[in-house]
Amino acid sequence: KNEQINKWEILDKWVEKYKEIDPDLLVTSSHATEKNLEMPFTVGNLKPRGGRLYADFMTPEFLDGTAHPRVYFAAGNCLIGNIDNDPESMAVAWLSGMDATSMIGYVVTTWYGRNGWGGLKYWVANAGRLTLAQAVYLNQQDMLRTENEWHPKMLTVNYPFSEIEFGQREMFEKQFKTVTGQQ
């Protein structure tokens, strides 16, 4: 059954399905920070408090952990894996209160997500043959191989994520173009 859900109801539906299914694997992709996961963008929020996650409804609804192993794969969520010395972070809540035994999440902003989605692809496509860590590692090796095929000197560039975020993107682009012979 293909049914359209109003964006204001997506978080409600997610919480309902989370409780109903008690999943072994959770995969998310939406805007996130160290302090929240928006589902969808700008509307519904999951937030951490006291090492647990709650749905930020009019009356906050805390989510329960699980009694079985759980993997949380934040394949397309910026910053959600960044603990930043804060026990009130999303990563701490997923690993403690939500009982994720493994978690993959970005500690930088991302708009492409090859590391997350590629790692998930390697893990799922090789189900039972690779550990989660091996799948992520092989994906990273594949990304390096691809960069080397595009232009070997790409591997010599330092990708300064924090500087790019703080308005120094032009400096990075100039360095990148110089190294790859585009300037």
Question: Where do the PLM segments sit?
Answer:
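Catalytic-core segments of thiol-dependent peptidases
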Residues: 1-88
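Active-site-proximal C-terminal subdomain of hydrolase catalytic domains
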Residues: 71, 75-183
